[in-house]
Amino acid sequence: MPLMTDTKKVMFEIYREASYSGRYKVVYFTELGEHDKETEIQEAMRGEHVFDGFLLHRERNQAKQIVDEILERLNRGEDVDQTTIEQNLQPYLA
């Protein structure tokens, strides 16, 4: 039986908004629709980069829960560095 690999990936970025609020957000680039793609990309580009990568498509729902937990921690003021983010997401990264 051949080994099956997941070739579909979800590209994402965690960033901090450039606006006064400075909230941490995520954008899933490969899931954007045509009507909101340009706006979302511009907002992410104006923000401060925190972490980016590719999620395995088949694991994306579980990965998004982890990303949401990371965002909650960041927005509460916790110091969550790139190494910690990568460790939390490691099982879901492509």
PLM regions and their residue ranges:
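Short, solvent-exposed polar/charged micro-motifs at secondary-structure junctions
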Residues: 24, 64-65, 90-94
